[in-house]
Amino acid sequence: MAIERTLSIIKPDATKRNLTGKINAKFEDAGLRIVAQKRIHLTKAQAGVFYAVHAERPFYDELCEFMASEPVVVQVLEGEGAIAKNREVMGATNPADAAPGTIRAEFAESVGENSVHGSDAPETAAVEIAYFFSGLELVG
């Protein structure tokens, strides 16, 4: 498998419960390296631009409000098959469907407050990483 990079966001429900370290440990235990990371507080407008792909979905406004409600941790993960590996470590979007030991099974509070976001494809990862990080900030 090729070395890839993917974007991960530790969402407000997890940052407000001080779960960043526990979530990062799960990424690292799975063989993913954190090559860039920062804690930021998104505005609703910034969240709206990031999640623009969902603009026509009924949950869009609630998602943007939630993502702007508390700080988030944005990070770039790197490793072999990083996109698929990250999605495996995160678990299913609905925590009730997430496999035991995954981030969402252990930490998510609901489908909407599911603790983490991860890119779903190489093209998406490139766009999402560029939204939050300059090339100088990627120090893999």
From Swiss-Prot:
Keywords: ATP-binding, Cytoplasm, Kinase, Magnesium, Metal-binding, Nucleotide metabolism, Nucleotide-binding, Phosphoprotein, Transferase. It comes from the Bacteria. GO terms for biological process: CTP biosynthetic process; GTP biosynthetic process; UTP biosynthetic process. InterPro entries: NDK-like_dom, NDK-like_dom_sf, Nucleoside_diP_kinase, Nucleoside_diP_kinase_AS. It is found in: Cytoplasm. GO terms for molecular function: ATP binding; metal ion binding; nucleoside diphosphate kinase activity. Its EC number is 2.7.4.6. One of its GO terms (cellular component) is cytoplasm. Gene3D superfamilies: Nucleoside diphosphate kinase-like domain. It catalyses: a 2'-deoxyribonucleoside 5'-diphosphate + ATP = a 2'-deoxyribonucleoside 5'-triphosphate + ADP; a ribonucleoside 5'-diphosphate + ATP = a ribonucleoside 5'-triphosphate + ADP. Its cofactor is Mg(2+). ATP binds at K11, F59, R87, T93, R104, N114. The active site is at H117 (pros-phosphohistidine intermediate). Belongs to the NDK family. PANTHER family: NUCLEOSIDE DIPHOSPHATE KINASE (PTHR46161), NUCLEOSIDE DIPHOSPHATE KINASE DDB_G0292928-RELATED (PTHR46161:SF3). Homotetramer. Major role in the synthesis of nucleoside triphosphates other than ATP. The ATP gamma phosphate is transferred to the NDP beta phosphate via a ping-pong mechanism, using a phosphorylated active-site intermediate. This is Nucleoside diphosphate kinase. It comes from Dinoroseobacter shibae (strain DSM 16493 / NCIMB 14021 / DFL 12). The gene is ndk.
